[in-house]
Structure formats: C-alpha cells, structure tokens
C-alpha cells in the first residue's frame, strides 16, 4: 500500500498523521525472541512486567512519545455488531470482498468468513489512488489506507491476515476525535494479558511500541542503530518524527531465535535496577529534546494526562492504567506497597469471541467511559495530587518489599536466595562503569547467563565431590 499526498488532509483530520508518517517510512523489525522473553514476565493483575528491577510497564507516556498518537479524546467504544456489514462496507468504500464459496458437497458447512477483508484483497484493490480521482474517491482511498495501517500495527491480531470491519467502521467519520493513544495501549495490555495466560504462541497489539519501549529502557535484545534516513517534514510540525526515529535503521539479528530466547530469559532474570535506563526521554528542561532531530509536538501535547489512573477502553477491552506502580519510570517517588487497584478478572474475561451476544460496548462499558472522561476533566481542572521526586532510599525500600512479595525469575534459580549478599544501594552502584556500559549497550553479559552458569557448575561439582566422602557414600567408604 503506497501513501498518496492527497490522503494527508484526511489523515490529519483523523488524528493519525504523526503515526502514519512513522509507519509509512517502514518500521524496525521485531526481535521475536526478546519480546517473548519479556512477555514471560508480564502479570495481568498489575499490568506490569515483574523483574528484579521492580515493576515496569508501557504507559501513556511511552505511547505518546513513541507513536505521537493523541491521548485526549474519546475512548473507542462502539457497537461492533457485524450484521449487515457487507452492505455498510459497500456504502462506505464502494466494494466488498467476495462471498465465501458454497461447499461442493451438501454435507459440508459453508465457509465462515470474519467481518472485514484480507490484507491481500485490500492491497489488490486500493494500492494506488487513480491520478484522475475526484475528492470522494480520494477520501475513500485515504479511509482504506488508514484502515489497512491501523489493522496491521495498532490493532494487529497476531495472524497478519485480516483487517476487521470494526476498525473501518471507526473511520466512518474522520473527525471522531478518538483517543487513539489510550485505545492502542488498552489493546496492547489485553494482548499481553492473553499471551501470558496461554500455552500457544502468537501475540498482537502495537509491537512497534512495545519493542521501542524495551530498547529504550532495557539492554536485553537491544539492536544497534546504523543510521537515520532523511525525514522530509514538508515544514509541517505534525510530520516531524516521533521518538521512534531514534531506531530508524538497525542491524538485524540473524541468530537462531530459540537459542537467543534462552539467552534473553537468563538476562532478564538477572537484570538489576542500576542497569535500566529509567528516564530515556530526558529530565527537566532536556525532556523530549533529542539531540539528533526535532520531535513531533504531538509526542508531548498531552503530557499532563500521562499520570492518570484510569480505565483504558478499546471496545470489549477495558484495562486499567496504573502509573503509580511504576513511578520510577517518571522520576517520581515510589511508595511501597503501591496502592492496590483491582484489575477485575471479570473484565479480563470479556472477549468479543466469547461474548458474542454483547454488541453495544458503548452501553456495556458506559461506567468506564465516564470514568475516563472524568479523569481527563480532573487533570485539566488541576485536581490531581502533588507528586514527589524520586528518592533513592524510598526506591530501595520498595525493592526490598517487592522482591519479597513476588516472583521475578522465569528460569529455575541455580542458587538459594539466602546465600546472596545484602542488597546494595542501587543509585551508588549505578555509577559504576560496568553498569553504565550495560545501560547503553545491548546485553547484560556476563553478569546474567555467565553468573548463573558458574554458580550451577560450581554447585554440580561440589555435589560430585561430596558424594566421594565417607558421609556421602552409601557404603560408608570414601576416597578422602
């Protein structure tokens, strides 16, 4: 699908111009092994990754900085009834995919086709807007282009085959003022929830945002940047690059994913707080000012909403945004334990495939839609708690509580916790040259797999030696 400059007014009106500019330049490849290892640490009950670093997660701040999508706006919560979708699609874009074929034998059922179209069908019919197209035709092609992009990126379902009808329906009116940023994060949270609770592979959601979030903060599976390709903003601030431009052209990994997955698992098990880039977007006056390029203003337009504790809504999916659990990522005081907020198992159970009878999600989730609107209203009215700056001692106390309260390792430990030294003062250790290099690098070797290997090897050899002693042998005879 090629972009046509005639689409720009409609993409701008829909609030998607910064994001479309990002993805049409081509997006960096996902490191599937690193993402899988990271998702192993996801906990649906807190919407955070549980690591030795404490809790970490993708927040509204990250979505805004990486994608340039608006946070302020309306939750995307509508009627997803697909009854008569073919007639509606025909009216909206002028054509529909062919009907499924009739079965050749009477005893076979008719092929079931999801409401929507395959990406192949869309590409074959809407790849290029005709040069002599009138305004209505250009508008149609722009609508289909946006449908194609959001279905493949923001709302990817893990199959890479179909663009659901509901996302095209959401683009019926361009100026709907959707809160695309909160919608994208809600969908990503739900995909992470589902992926962490099932035994089969596959995950959807905006993996572009998740990947760049990980690369910015964690030195595990981080690629090396090669260069920046020229970015023509056409003197339009909304066409300036987002923070994702820092990862414009990368060196791709060609290693065996199964081997790298084991390595990444070990590294994530061993990563420590001082090896994390906690505030990658800068601090104070330098916040949001990358040295290499000018940042798109949409990245920071809604920064006053980043700390909202609110429901994030994407049709059937309602997921809570809990930034107070990861205040260290904002350079703020981390209390312990963080105030508990129930993420509600009943909400997690809501699924458009399992609850087919529920169609009008705007009515079903009205309470949460109102909560989101009130959260925005309270922030804009200046009604929010005063937040304190990061305190190293408080964060150390939080870590002591956190590590005693949850599981942070995926791999079976090779040692008993009681043999470890007392916790160090993390902010002091962070100044050590090794940890500074790790934060900026792309691996925590040798402290992760190597340390685990050495300890396990020593334990195995010690066990072998002890078995040769009189006390260790069953017959009472030993070599010593």
What residues fall within each predicted segment?
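Structural stabilizers in ordered domains
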Residues: 1-480
């Amino acid at each position: 699908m090629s972009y046509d400059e005639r689409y720009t007014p409609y993409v701008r009106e829909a609030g998607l111009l910064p994001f479309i500019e990002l993805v049409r330049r081509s997006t960096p490849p996902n490191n599937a092994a690193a993402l899988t290892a990271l998702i192993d640490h996801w906990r649906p009950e807190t919407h955070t990754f549980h690591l030795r670093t404490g809790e970490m997660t993708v927040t509204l701040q990250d979505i805004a900085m990486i994608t340039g999508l608006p946070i302020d706006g309306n939750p995307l919560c509508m009627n997803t009834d697909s009854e008569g979708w073919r007639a509606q699609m025909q009216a909206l874009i002028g054509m529909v995919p062919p009907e499924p074929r009739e079965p050749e034998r009477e005893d076979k059922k008719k092929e079931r086709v999801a409401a929507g179209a395959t990406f192949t069908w869309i590409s074959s019919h809407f790849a290029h807007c005709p040069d002599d197209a009138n305004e209505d035709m250009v508008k149609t092609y722009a609508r289909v282009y946006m449908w194609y992009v959001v279905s493949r990126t923001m709302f990817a379902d893990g199959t890479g085959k179909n663009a659901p009808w509901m996302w095209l329906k959401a683009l019926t009116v361009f100026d709907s003022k959707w809160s695309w940023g909160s919608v994208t994060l809600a969908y990503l949270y739900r995909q992470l929830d589902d992926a962490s609770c099932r035994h089969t592979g596959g995950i959807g959601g905006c993996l572009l945002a998740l990947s760049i979030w990980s690369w910015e903060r964690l030195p595990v599976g981080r690629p090396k940047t090669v260069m920046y390709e020229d970015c023509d903003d056409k003197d339009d601030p909304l066409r300036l690059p987002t923070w994702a431009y820092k990862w414009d052209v990368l060196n791709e990994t060609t290693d065996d994913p199964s081997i790298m997955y084991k390595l990444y698992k070990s590294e994530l098990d061993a990563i420590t707080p001082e090896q994390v880039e906690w505030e990658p977007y800068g601090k104070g006056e330098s916040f949001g000012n990358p040295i290499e390029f000018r940042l798109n203003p949409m990245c920071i337009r809604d920064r006053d909403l980043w700390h909202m504790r609110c429901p994030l809504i994407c049709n059937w999916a309602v997921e809570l945004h809990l930034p107070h659990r990861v205040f260290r990522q904002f350079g703020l005081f981390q209390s312990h334990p963080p105030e508990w907020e129930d993420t509600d198992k009943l909400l997690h159970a809501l699924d458009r495939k399992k609850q087919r009878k529920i169609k009008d999600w705007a009515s079903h989730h009205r309470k949460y839609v109102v909560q989101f609107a009130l959260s925005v209203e309270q922030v804009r009215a200046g009604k929010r708690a005063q937040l304190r700056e990061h305190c190293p001692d408080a964060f150390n106390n939080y870590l002591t509580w956190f590590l005693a309260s949850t599981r942070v390792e995926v791999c079976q430990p090779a040692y008993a916790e009681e043999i470890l030294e007392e916790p160090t003062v993390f902010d002091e250790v962070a100044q050590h040259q090794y940890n500074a290099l790790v934060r900026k690098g792309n691996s925590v070797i040798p402290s992760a797999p190597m340390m685990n290997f050495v300890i396990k090897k020593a334990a195995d050899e010690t066990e072998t030696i002890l078995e040769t002693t009189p006390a260790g042998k069953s017959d009472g005879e030993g070599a010593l």
